[in-house]
Amino acid sequence: MQRLLTYRALNFILFIASVVAMLFAIIFLQNYKGLEPCPLCIFQRIGLMVMGGFSLIAAVGHPKKMGMQLLLWIGSMAGILWSAGVAARHVWIQHLPADQVPACGPGLDYFLEALPMKQVINQVLSGSGECAEISWRFLGLSIPEQALILFTALILVNLLVLWRIISKRTA
């Protein structure tokens, strides 16, 4: 059990979890089920990839200095907190009464071409009608609800990484 909780192993777990989640989204949800990701789903994936990237660098690079470990941890945690925040917003939009659901707007491609990045982020986080649609459920949970559970678990693993960084220095 002790070997499973090393700094390197925990970062590999985070990286593998991000790869598995992305493969599930792309292969199963998009290709097999034919579900296209809404802008909020895409934003969640971006945060997941950020977390996975920083975790891979931490696992492979295995830095010895606490400062570098903390920097990589901050990057990883920022990515997954972003994903969790966007997923929470997505769940909230899906639970709005029908008369309060934002109207459908242009897609993310249009926003990226026509607007500055700050406005793109504001528009996407405002949500749209397509983000309120629940197109698939598993165990009674929508995709954003499942994602929020996953992201919460990954936040907990990230906190274990922080614990490993700090506990090595205080021991």
UniProtKB/Swiss-Prot annotation:
Localization, UniProt: Cell inner membrane
Instruction: Please provide the record's keywords in A-Z order.
Output: Cell inner membrane, Cell membrane, Chaperone, Disulfide bond, Electron transport, Membrane, Oxidoreductase, Redox-active center, Transmembrane, Transmembrane helix, Transport
A GO BP entry: protein folding
Q: What is its main location?
A: membrane
Cytoplasmic topology: which positions? 1-10, 64-70, 165-171
Cellular component terms (Gene Ontology): plasma membrane
Query: GO MF annotations for this entry?
Result: electron transfer activity; protein-disulfide reductase activity
State the annotated membrane topology for this chain: Multi-pass membrane protein
Membrane side Periplasmic: which residues?
A: 28-46, 89-145
Note the SS bond partners.
38-41, 104-131
Instruction: Give the matching Gene3D superfamilies.
Output: DsbB-like
- Kindly give the HAMAP family that the UniProt entry links to this protein: DsbB
Tell me its family.
Answer: Belongs to the DsbB family.
The protein's role, per its UniProt record: Required for disulfide bond formation in some periplasmic proteins. Acts by oxidizing the DsbA protein.
**Family matches, as PANTHER family:** DISULFIDE BOND FORMATION PROTEIN B
Question: What's the protein name?
Answer: Disulfide bond formation protein B
Q: Which organism is it from?
A: Psychrobacter sp. (strain PRwf-1)
Report the gene name: dsbB
